[in-house]
Amino acid sequence: MSKIFKNRLEGLRALNRGVRALAKAVTSTLGPQGSHVVIKKDHSSPYVTKQGASIAKEIILPDAFENTGLKLIKEAALQMEAQVGDGSTTAIVLTDALFASGLKGVAVGLDPLEIKQGIQLAGAMLDEELAKLVVKISESEDIFHIATSSANHDAAIGKILADAIAQIGIEGVLSIKEGRGTETTLQATRHVGLNSGYLSSYFVTHPETMEVIYEDASILLCNQALSCLNQSFIHFLEQTFQTNRKPLIIIAEDFDPELLSILIVNKLKGNLPVCAIKAPGYGQQCKETLEDIAILTGATLVGDLLGISLSESSLDVLGRVEKIIVKRNTTIFSGGKGNQESLEQRIDYLRQAIVQSSSEMDTQDLEKRLARFVGGVAQIYLGSATENEYKERKIRLESALKAVKAAFKEGCLPGGGVALARAASIIKIPNELPIGVMFGCKCMLQSAEEPLRVLATNCGKDPEYVVDTVLKHADPYFGYNCINDSFENLITSGVFDPFSVTKCALKYSISISCLLLTSSFFIVDSSEKMQNPPLF
């Protein structure tokens, strides 16, 4: 397959046109007064969005070199969406401004490596100044403002997410499902749960609700399948029946049908209030679930493979809960009697494992396990009039959730592009720097004002006037509120940006811009359709 080549300046200009094309498409969407973009795919209905990452996914340019520039900045936008859920448009705006200004230096003969050094130097100083502006959030109203902003100013999504987090905590597990009709509803519980229920309806104690409900119940956890041939289990059951009249909940890998019948008969005769539950999952996942429940209830996980046989166990292996509610497919524990030190150790372990996890699936499993200890579980049934509206609102809600979690983790900055502009205005560039490094610093600091300028433009304001008015004010949190068209303290009025979102947008824009500016030769496949637009 033949290749096509371009030299440094010609190639950089072509890549810059690709970056600029994507920036033009998403710039008008930034902020509460930003416009929507209509996207129509083959064999599907058109849908409307303001998500920068969603727009970036759909744009392809006919020129192979321009498309290369677009693909690189698109990757930054998609990384932003995956990592922190918000800020993809800001990252694109920053990259466009930074690359375009840096390219001017390359065009007049400045050393690209010095320009890169200057950009990175100013970027590090911006990070330091931004950290000084961080404020912590805690109130439900703060969550509402952040979620609403990250959901493209959808107040309904902001409210439902704030309500969910108020009920299950920031470390709870939230799932999104399609609702019935246009109404969005929330179901949440803070109790510990299992995605598994009773194995037979004969265990039910409350027929009107088809639930098994016991108070002050004992918990037996077995990391093995149980059968009536297992004499050690039968002996343990008899011992429990004779000395412990509390309800017995047995959670095991599996149950032999004959053993299940024996348990049902004992329950129906009133000999022993009992319920059998099959542990969810298989293999290691099942074992980890049982270990979590053991720590929560104070039980000892028994099983031949663990070296802890029922034949050698006393009633001390039983855990306890204040109350348990078992349905056909779910189990809810309340008031587990686990050791507090063991609980804290397991919570620390799970939090550390989440930080170190590199797999999204593993991270989700770990978050669900952590929710058993410190949070709860919530389901949002998202209302919508059409399937496309549901998909778009689901993307907004997922983005808002990531942004809120990011805000809790690292705090917030005054929003509306103000934090970057104010941090840039504080930084003083050392005079003794080489000319290329100094130029790179200036490129970075000037580009940091671009998100604020774009927001002002989208609100119909003079960007120069807005920037000057904001930066002249002594209050570091003073800025322009696009929602009510006023200058005020943005923290007080609830205009936030998660610190990690701004930090990531800065990081990715610097990374992509420096990568492009220090490239000197460009190669693409000639099989890609080519056009020859005039160089600027």
Curated annotation (Swiss-Prot):
Belongs to the chaperonin (HSP60) family. Together with its co-chaperonin GroES, plays an essential role in assisting protein folding. The GroEL-GroES system forms a nano-cage that allows encapsulation of the non-native substrate proteins and provides a physical environment optimized to promote and accelerate protein folding. ATP binds at residues 29-32, 50, 416, 497. The keyword Nucleotide-binding applies. Pfam families: Cpn60_TCP1. The keyword Cytoplasm applies. This is Chaperonin GroEL 2. One of its GO terms (molecular function) is ATP-dependent protein folding chaperone.
